[in-house]
Amino acid sequence: MINVNEFKPGITFEDEGNIYVVLTAQHSKQGRGQANVKAKVKNLRTGSTTLKSYTGGDKVQKAHIEKKPMDYLYNDGSNIILMDQESFEQIEIDVKKVEWELNFLTEGMKILVRQYQNEILDIEIPINIELKVINAPDAVKGNTTTNPQKKVIVETGYELEVPMFIKEGETIIVSSETGKYGGKSSK
């Protein structure tokens, strides 16, 4: 059992028959009242994100999740195809479970598959991902307000805002947690 006061990002638990991973946890105490914990959690079975509230001191069942290293091969439209790095066995995961992660997956990427009692839940990808910019408009002269940004499209089709100096063909670092620009790659 896990005390909800110990919630922090990455903790997996079972609640009402579902498996969740904590994305963010906010602890608050009201005057003489009891402490509350609000946690933004992801349901690992459905892929949906929700906000759960608990009273301080509540306990939930810990979910022991196995993480298996795999390679991302391709997306066939309804499933992503992954290959086990040891047995070369291929598995499929419904794209609905990994909608956010699809924005960052590139062929051959090393990822972790989360399993609970032999049930494949979803995937875990690196936090910082290097992606090539395939479409970037030129910087417009005179467009220099504080911290000017422009929208670019990376090789996976994901669109994000980056500083004006980023050019087409450059490799940038993107955070898979926030989807935001994290810096220029050294590649």
UniProtKB/Swiss-Prot annotation:
Record localization: Cytoplasm
InterPro entries: Elong-fact-P_C, NA-bd_OB-fold, Rib_uL2_dom2, Transl_elong_fac_P/YeiP, Transl_elong_KOW-like, Transl_elong_P/YeiP_cen, Transl_elong_P/YeiP_CS, Transl_elongation_fac_P
Gene3D superfamilies: 2.30.30.30, Nucleic acid-binding proteins
SUPFAM superfamilies for the chain: Nucleic acid-binding proteins, Translation proteins SH3-like domain
Keywords, ordered alphabetically: Cytoplasm, Elongation factor, Protein biosynthesis
Cellular component per GO, a single term: cytoplasm
Pathway in which the depicted protein is active: Protein biosynthesis; polypeptide chain elongation
Function in brief: Involved in peptide bond synthesis. Stimulates efficient translation and peptide-bond synthesis on native or reconstituted 70S ribosomes in vitro. Probably functions indirectly by altering the affinity of the ribosome for aminoacyl-tRNA, thus increasing their reactivity as acceptors for peptidyl transferase.
Classification via PANTHER family: ELONGATION FACTOR P, ELONGATION FACTOR P (EF-P) FAMILY PROTEIN
Name this protein carries in UniProt: Elongation factor P
Organism: Mycoplasmopsis pulmonis (strain UAB CTIP)
Gene name tied to this protein: efp
